[in-house]
Amino acid sequence: HGRFGEQLAGIFKTACAGIEDLPEGSEGPDEITWFPERAWAGRVWIPASATGTAVMEEGTEPVPIEYFGYVSFVQPPDSDPRDFEASADFTDVLAEDNPDWQIDLGDEVIGKWCGENGREADVTLIWGQALVRDAYAVSAELREMTVDQDPLFSNRFTLIAPDNLRNYGDEGYLEIKLWNVRGRQLAQESLYAIEAKPEDGEAEEEKDAPAA
């Protein structure tokens, strides 16, 4: 809110304007929806989304798109935020066009976790919105182990968790789950869409495009 909110909005809009493959003549982001902030590696991370329009194919009418990404900064204990960074992209795959969706997810890798004997994982910023009723909390689970969780705020959430676990035997990928206030699971989504299974048995997976 206030001047700081305006500063964050300006940084995010600048990142949106710098998207390399944004179609020429696209309408920039309108009102920005902010997701709960989380802290990791000495920085504060605030995901964001906003609507706009773009001409996806020459000679066609503009269609709605969603801008998505985050603003990140360092918050010293006794001074103003500094070292602002932002990332943005866009998609024309929207939740409003997919009534079967239960969770609207976005994600971006923001770092790497390195363990012993070459073990590693992608530290991933995950944000989204519950599209089912009565959702109270969200969890990120890796191999059925909860690695982050948080209550929802206005049906929105932000998590930071390790994903794409490697060199632990079987690879591990995050599952995002919604829960009601009584601890009943309401929905479950992966960050990945399994396209095919190659002959060697390893699933060929592709990240879902975030949408709202």
For the regions a protein language model found, what residue spans apply to each?
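Short, non-transmembrane alpha-helical segments in secretory-pathway proteins
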Residues: 1-32, 136-138
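Ser/Thr-rich low-complexity repeats and stalk/linker segments
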Residues: 119-200
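A general sequence property marking short-to-moderate contiguous segments
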Residues: 12-20, 43-116
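Short amphipathic beta-strand and strand-loop transition segments with alternating hydrophobic
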Residues: 24-41, 110-117
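Low-complexity, Pro/Ser/Thr- and charge-rich linker/hinge segments at domain boundaries
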Residues: 196-212
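N-terminal non-globular leader segments, chiefly Sec-dependent signal peptides
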Residues: 1, 9, 40-41, 50-54, ...
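Generic recognition of long tandem-repeat/solenoid scaffolds
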Residues: 46-48, 83-86, 126, 159-160, ...
